[in-house]
Amino acid sequence: MSRIGFSRTQILILVSVWLTFLISFVMRLSWASLMPIVNEALNFTPQMGTTYLSAFYMGYAIMVLPGGILADRIGYRYTILVSLLSMAVITALMSTIDNYTYGWVLRFLLGIVSGPVQASCLSAIGDYFGPNQRGAAVGIFMSCT
């Protein structure tokens, strides 16, 4: 990456936001492959499984714009930290799912706390990378998806 002209600090920031968004992205997509097992274990119908998956995206869609505003108001570092810690807690709580409603609420909340992540990561890139570096930095950042 030194050929691109990134400093060590910039590389550290880029790796950090890349890993942060990767975690958020995996949270978003991993459940689709788990749904056959979840449906069977929790006696979900196919329709319940579909709406269960959709709960994340409903929460995410609600929080993307306010999450970006929140990152601007309180800072992207704090927003990323709170989002990651909240994702960890909610993911741990998912191991206690015993019914559809509880699982749906947790998926929805996971979407809510994941919403600010992308905007916060892009704010960090905006702060640490100059105008001639941002395109490459954003391209590398988005490669985790």
Regions found by a protein language model. Name each.
Residues L12-P46:
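Extracytoplasmic
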Residues T45-L53:
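Juxtamembrane helix-start elements in MFS-like secondary transporters
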